[in-house]
Curated annotation (Swiss-Prot):
GO cellular component, one term: extracellular matrix
Motif segment (Cysteine switch): 190-197
This protein's encoding gene: adt-1
Signal peptide: 1-21
Residues modified by glycosylation: 69, 212
Tissue and organ distribution: In hermaphrodites, expressed in the vulva, head ganglia, ventral nerve cord and amphid neurons. Expressed in the rays of the male tail.
Protein name, as recorded: A disintegrin and metalloproteinase with thrombospondin motifs adt-1
Organism per entry: Caenorhabditis elegans
Domain Disintegrin: 464-546
Length: 1461
């Protein structure tokens, strides 16, 4: 299927009748300038106006005009911000000789903003400089004011007009778009490369992660946030032109090369600006030059030694760093700061393909280093390439390759072709997503600042279209090189250049990356217009221009040093001239003669002994085939001698008869008899052996005169026939100084002597067999002689031959070119006779597994607004949180906290009072006292809601027991407690006990019991009653107590019994015991653990914690922890304590102990443990090197969620200040006891705490600023196989800052990936088969059954673990139970009070599955048992922390952060 591209065609419609007709006199450029449209049929409704202006003394302006029978009154104020006076232009001669110019001349402030007083103070922006223009924002449309071109002023008295424009992003005409698919037969080549390997850690990330932002859907593109009204999108650029480009213009323009280069570069930027002002791109982007730098000599950082042709990546890397160094300040600090650096280069940045012409980093705009692009700058068509590369830098990707748009459509297409002058919908979405990312990044969007730019240059001001300024031949020479001109391939016509400009150099035909420029002559009496070859419609038709030669150039360089590369070479100075004085255009005649010649330096005899021509060609072809940077592996490595183009190096292609031009022989290389190479052409030695020319007219002048003399006649040629009659001989002579010698230059005569009769032969016979079975042999064939005399050598022919099977065995495969993401490897074999069929090189794909891309996210905001806090960031692997080493933390210090003496200092909170209600909902309170400062009374106490268990139902007294007829345990008695009717849903209570207990109750005064009669008890009955065999009478003695029997009730206080047997005569006093059991409330679903040991051994800061443990896996119970201060601890003054100092002599941060391993995750099949970096001394910057967590594979035993629990607090750090001010102490804990697993809840509350500390000593005047220690050794690699990293740190302790000295600047932590395939024998895990389903947990009603599998077939070893669930649970399909009761939710409780920090918080409400509860196999309640919503506190009750800007609440408790000093 041939490639295709999309041509966007606008189907335009006229929506109103225009009363005025002045627009019919405007050309297309004027229509665009005035109305923003290209077609006269699309002109909007407008009115010609006469604007009256009244300047005021304060510099403001009043203006009035009438349009559509309505008068508009405007009050305007000067806007002096749109132009900066600090523009800089630079001409550089190397590093030391620099000329700098500053400022704009003759600039006046003539731009205004204001309101339309006559129309509801609608906003207006008006400019009244050389021309009046501006806009008025009405409610449902815009009014746009414009000045008419001077060319049509004579047609009417009005000089201005105003027209209406829809407020939509697209006009009605623009919204009617049709896509037409046009197929192309031409080959399309990539013209763009994106930088992926710049020498910077951030640039080693694969390209598809360079732009880690979300691309919005088209439905989101009208967001007022993405397109804010009046919010400028301006790209300020620094434009750099390298010395190679300057050399090109110095060759082309003998005089004023700098001026020509300036005009050309500004024209190119002007074209780019037009592309970014298209209606297909929203919002439009203004491009302004704030720095212009021309290098007549290359800076040392970008000298030729640093790079060479074909090294685009290294050149871009060097330039990006150079322009970043030259870029002053920031957008906020320096008005000469630019957003993006552009290098227009004269180098061929990719020598393996002439199509690739630009390269830029992806999504790095506003980056301080890599907001830059590199583009070949020899042709105006590079404006398309530069716009494309700038698009990459602003987040756009290739259409059809990395998004869903057509790959052949628009400016972000990755291939060459015509019609690519618009932006696709995908590019618009990507551009706006990148703008949104910059807006939300927190670093600022450098594109949203107003431009202080250079005055724009309109290169159409002389009314010449680009194609009239630069002919089609000049466009080819700028694009491909000096020798390239328009060359139409077979099957094409001249008018095709308007769609694709074809260029050639008498070799292979090449298509350029753009159509011919607007106004280019395309044959007959036609010119290019909008991609079509049409008649001229822009006024006077251009007249034909005949070409004339420029002067010969190159003489000023002198003769080169002789280079003996090819044997027999002579020293030649090449000279060149161009047909550009003027260039032929519009069908005019081209120059006659050659454009190149060579001046012989010295003698024509040569003693050079170098390579043969064959050896030199082979050397060039082989070096290009095996180039380490850009190899051309289609070449065989062998050269080819071309008979008609002997001065070009041609190389064979593998597996075909094709050849490819890969260079040329050096000037002076012999290419025939008395002929030598100059600039890739073979020229004859002439002009008295003084020059190499194509014709005598090109000989250099000798002292101002020409010599017109014939050279000697050549020898007679051989006869034109070898036998028979009719042959002739020829001889020639040449005019030494041109074509003005008298006489003829050629003579001929009949052949002298008698020729023999011609031989006649029969047909050739078939070729014989090859003389060798393997390797080179010979084949012969014969033919008969049909005359009397035939030479024997004419009767036989030989040719070389070989047979198949002469290959050596294949070599081993080479190493793969990539470690992941798809690479290539190859192997070779050799042919024993150099004539084998087949390829000597074989390639295949390798390492196709996906690369794991990793990137650290931004640091989260500091945890505190003042003092020492923490910041956290996460590491993403392929867009998801990495499995290991996925978090980092560091200390942060936003600003110093206010002095403790200016704050209110409170004592610790007292204990919470007992709940005011014993059941249901009540209140608790606690108090604290003011220690220092201006405390407010309202902050001295807190109240919170408390909820105890549900209130018990009210019952009447118990009834009498029923009667026991025996004392057997097989009989029982009952009693009933009736409800008193005061509560709802109350059911009668029934109490039951066995009669043996009743008898004991009577015997031991438990209560009366009725008379009983004997009952026969068999041994079987006893065995059932006591659960053991009946013993003989003689063996009955006192026995051990039996196990306790079951409790009489499951909750609400019951009793249980145990017994022991004995002989009647020796029975102890008691052989039956009872006790209470199941004392918990019937609604209790949890129990509290014991209080932990105190976190401190002395003082008042000790903390004890306990956990709430759920008794059942029920939605109504959620685990959490609570803490309290330890009591009765001794004073720390009696206990000596000291802080351990590290061997370095300072308190370095240190790792905490590892936590316990988490429960095995059913999702990742791993168990995790973690630790945290404990800050001992806040004044010592630094971090802990090594992994913050570890993971091991595991097989889960259960998939039940496990909520996390806090570890104990670490010890308080030392004070962050050592003198004279209030500092802070910090401590840490982590959610690791246990670590949450299987999607269990994370801990609520802070993982860190801080309190103020006051240093009484006064700082001395001798401040000590901090200094860095050496970097620590790299930590061990966390995983040599997957996502491995190692880290190192350094400390601000050499010396440690003291006496108010400054902290160290720079990074205190470094992280590097590590990977060692030698240590990995990677093996991905595989699931075992599922086990059988377990029996159902119930026989009726609600029951479940489970099954499981393990990641053991095989177990993972460094590779991927199994994905999916290891356990499955399913509901059983059971019949209903006889008396089952499904659970139902109770009504929601009232919302709790609002709890939060600084007026913003949350409130909760709960419900329980008790209306009714589940019983006898019924279904449980499904859904949430609690809800949380945001709320706002009234100003009178809102509480704010002094040191922390946001609070996390844990189950209604305020986290106490304002500790005592």
């Amino acid at each position: 299927m041939p490639p295709f591209y999309i041509v966007i065609t606008f189907l335009l419609s006229t929506v109103f009748r225009i009363s005025q007709s002045v627009h019919h006199h405007l050309n297309e450029e004027e229509l665009k300038q005035v109305f923003g449209v290209s077609n006269k049929h699309d002109v909007p409704e407008y009115s010609l106006i006469e604007a009256t202006r009244h300047p005021l003394k304060n510099g403001n302006l009043k203006m009035k005009f009438t349009a559509w029978n309505d008068t508009y009154h405007l009050n305007l104020r000067k806007n002096s911000r749109i132009v900066s006076p600090h523009i800089i232009s630079v001409v550089r001669h190397g590093d030391d000789d620099v000329t700098t110019y500053a400022g704009l001349r003759d600039y006046e402030q003539c731009h205004y903003q204001g309101e339309v007083k006559s129309h509801g103070n609608m906003k207006a922006a008006i400019s009244d400089c050389g021309a009046l223009m501006g806009s008025i924002v009405m409610e449902d449309h815009f009014l746009v004011l414009q000045t008419l071109p001077k060319r049509v002023h004579h047609l009417q008295k009005e000089r201005h007009l105003v027209y209406k424009r829809s407020a939509g992003l697209l006009t009605n005409a623009e919204s009617k778009i049709r896509e037409e698919i046009t197929r192309l037969q031409e080959e399309q080549e990539s013209f763009c490369d994106t930088s992926e390997q710049l020498d910077d850690p951030a640039m080693t990330i694969p390209a598809h992660l360079h732009f880690n932002y979300t691309i919005p859907t088209s439905a989101q593109l009208d967001s007022s946030f993405i397109f804010p009204n009046m919010d400028p999108i301006t790209l300020e650029i620094g434009l750099f032109l390298d010395s190679k480009l300057f050399e090109h213009f110095e060759r082309e323009y003998i005089q004023d090369a700098e001026q020509h280069l300036l005009e050309f570069s500004l024209a190119l930027i002007n074209n780019v600006h037009v592309l970014y002002q298209q209606d297909t791109l929203t919002p439009n982007l203004d491009i302004v030059i704030v720095r212009y730098e021309m290098w007549r000599t290359q800076p040392s950082a970008l000298s030729t030694g640093v790079h060479k042709n074909g090294q685009a990546q290294s050149l871009l890397d060097a330039f990006c760093r150079y322009q970043a160094h030259m870029n002053p300040g920031t957008d906020l600090t320096d008005m000469n700061h630019y957003d993006h650096g552009v290098l227009l280069t004269g180098y061929d940045i990719y020598h393996t393909t002439t199509s690739v012409a630009g390269v830029a980093p992806v999504a790095r705009m506003c980056d301080p280093l890599f907001a830059c692009s590199l583009v070949e700058g020899l042709h105006l068509g590079r404006s398309f390439v530069l716009a494309h590369e700038m698009g990459h830098n602003m987040g756009m990707v290739h259409d059809g390759v990395q998004n869903q748009c057509n790959k052949g459509c628009c400016l972000m297409s990755a291939v060459n072709g015509a019609g690519k002058t618009t932006w696709s919908d995908c590019s618009v979405r990507e551009f706006n997503a990148f703008l949104l990312q910059l807006d939300e990044s927190g670093r600022g969007n450098c594109l949203r600042d107003a431009s202080p730019g250079l005055i724009s240059t309109n290169h159409l001001s002389d009314l010449r279209l680009p194609g009239q300024r630069f002919t089609a031949d000049q466009q080819c020479s700028y694009f491909w090189g000096r020798d390239y001109k328009v060359e139409i391939p077979n099957g094409k016509a001249m008018d095709d250049i308007c769609r694709i400009l074809w260029c050639g150099n008498s070799g292979s035909t090449i298509s350029t990356a753009h159509p011919a420029l607007e106004g280019s002559w395309c044959g007959a009496n036609k010119w290019c217009h909008k991609g079509q070859c049409t008649h001229w419609t822009f006024g006077l038709t251009p007249v034909p221009i005949d070409g004339e030669w420029s002067e010969w150039g190159g003489a000023e360089k002198g003769c080169p040093i002789q280079q003996c590369a090819v044997s027999g070479s002579i020293t030649v100075q090449g000279q060149h001239r161009d047909c550009v004085n003027p260039a032929p255009n519009n069908g005019g005649k081209t120059c006659e003669g050659a454009n190149i010649r060579g001046i012989v330096c010295g003698a024509t005899s040569s003693n050079c002994l170098g390579f043969t021509r064959e050896e030199f060609g082979n050397k060039i072809c082989s070096s290009i085939k095996y180039d380490p940077h850009k190899p051309d592996q289609q070449l065989t490595g062998e050269g080819f001698e071309h008979s008609t183009q002997p001065c070009r190096v041609w190389c064979h292609l593998i597996g075909s008869e094709l050849i490819r031009n890969k260079g040329q022989f050096p000037d002076g290389t012999p290419c025939g008899f008395d002929a030598y190479c100059v600039g890739g052409q073979c020229l004859a030695l002439s002009c008295d052996n003084k020059a190499l020319v194509e014709q005598p007219e090109d000989c250099p002048r000798i002292e101002g005169r020409s010599v017109h003399q014939w050279e000697e006649w050549s020898s007679w040629s051989e006869c034109s026939v070898s036998c028979g009659l009719g042959g002739r001989e020829v001889r020639e002579r040449k005019c030494s100084s041109g074509r003005k010698c008298q006489g003829v230059s050629e003579e001929s005569r009949p052949c002298e002597g008698v020729l023999r009769d011609c031989e006649e032969f029969g047909e050739w016979k078939e070729w014989g067999s090859c003389s060798e079975k393997c390797a080179l042999g010979v084949q012969k064939r014969f033919r008969p002689c049909l005359t009397d005399q035939c030479s024997s050598k004419h009767l036989q022919e030989e040719r070389p031959c070989d047979n198949e099977g002469c290959w050596t065995n294949w070599d081993e495969w080479s190493s793969c070119s990539q470690s992941c993401g798809g690479g290539r490897r190859y192997r070779i074999r050799k042919c024993l006779d150099d004539k084998c069929d087949g390829d000597d090189l074989e390639k295949e794909s390798c390492n196709t597994q996906k690369c794991i891309s990793q990137s650290w996210g931004d640091w989260l905001p500091c945890s505190v607004s003042c003092g020492i806090g923490f910041q956290i960031r996460e590491r993403l692997c392929d867009g998801e949180l990495c499995a290991t080493a996925n978090k980092q933390a560091r200390t942060c210090n936003q600003q110093q906290c206010p002095s403790a003496f200016s704050l209110s200092v409170w004592s610790e909170w007292g204990e919470w009072t007992t709940c005011s209600a014993t059941c249901g909902e009540g209140l608790q309170s606690r108090e604290r006292s003011c220690r220092r400062g201006s405390c407010t009374e309202d902050d001295a106490s807190q109240t919170r809601r408390c909820v105890n268990g549900p209130c018990e139902h009210s019952y009447l007294t118990w009834s009498e027991w029923t009667t026991c007829e025996t004392c057997s345990s097989f009989d029982s008695r009952k009693r009933i407690a009736k409800c008193d009717g005061t509560t709802e849903n109350c059911q009668d209570k029934i109490d039951e006990e066995t009669c043996d207990i009743a008898c004991l109750r009577e015997k031991h005064s438990f209560g009366p019991i009725s008379p009983r009669r004997p009952k026969l008890i068999t041994s079987n009955d006893l065995r059932k009653a006591f659960g053991r065999p009946l013993l003989p009478i003689e063996s009955i003695h006192s026995e051990k107590w039996s196990e306790w029997g079951p409790c009489s009730v499951t909750c609400g206080s019951g009793r249980r019994v145990r017994t022991r047997g004995c002989q009647e005569a020796s029975c102890p006093e008691q052989h039956i015991q009872t006790e209470e059991c199941n004392l918990n409330s019937c609604l209790e679903l949890f129990i509290w653990s014991d209080w932990s040991s105190c976190s401190k051994s002395c003082g008042q800061d000790g903390i004890q914690t306990r956990q709430k443990l759920c008794l059942f896996n029920n939605a109504e119970c959620s685990s959490y922890a609570e803490s309290r201060r330890c009591k009765d601890l001794p004073s720390c003054s009696s206990i000596s304590s000291g802080r351990t100092i590290s061997e370095n002599g300072f308190d370095a941060p240190r790792w905490s102990e590892w936590s316990s391993w988490s429960a095995c995750s059913c999702f990742s099949l791993t168990s995790t443990r973690r630790r945290f970096c404990q800050v001992v001394d806040p004044t010592v910057q630094g971090f802990c090197a090594g992994a913050i967590l570890e993971q091991i594979p595991c097989a889960p035993g259960s998939c039940s969620p496990s909520a996390g629990g806090w570890s104990l607090w670490s010890e308080w750090s030392s004070c962050s200040k050592d003198c004279g001010d209030t500092g802070h102490q910090i401590r840490n804990r982590m959610c690791s006891e246990p670590i949450p697993s299987n999607r269990g809840a994370y801990c609520s509350g802070y993982s860190f705490d801080q309190r103020p500390c006051v240093m009484d000593n006064v700082c001395s005047d001798e401040k000590v600023d901090g200094g860095w220690t050496d970097w620590t050794a790299w930590s061990e690699c966390t995983d040599y196989c997957r996502n491995g990293h190692r880290s190192r740190t350094r400390f601000c302790a050499n010396p440690k800052p003291s006496q108010g000295g400054a902290q160290c600047t720079g990074s205190d932590f470094e992280l590097n990936p590590c990977f060692d395939p030698a240590r990995c024998h990677l093996r991905d895990g595989g699931w075992s088969t599922w086990s059988d389903w377990t029996p159902c947990s119930a026989s009726c009603g609600f029951g479940v059954q489970t099954r499981d599998r393990s990641c053991s077939s095989p177990e993972p070893k460094g590779g991927q673990s199994c994905s999916g669930l290891a356990h499955q649970t399913s509901l059983c399909d059971l019949p209903a139970c006889d008396h089952e009761s499904d659970g139902e939710w109770s009504a929601w409780n009232e919302w709790s009070g609002c709890m939060g920090n600084c007026g913003i918080g949350t409130r909760t409400r709960v419900r329980a599955c008790v209306s009714p509860p589940v019983s006898d196999g019924g279904q449980p309640c499904f859904g949430r048992s609690s809800e949380i919503t945001e709320c706002r506190q009234s100003p009178s009750t809102a509480l704010c922390s002094s040191f922390i800007t946001s609070s996390h609440l844990a189950d209604g408790y305020f986290i106490d952060t304002d500790q005592q000093q």
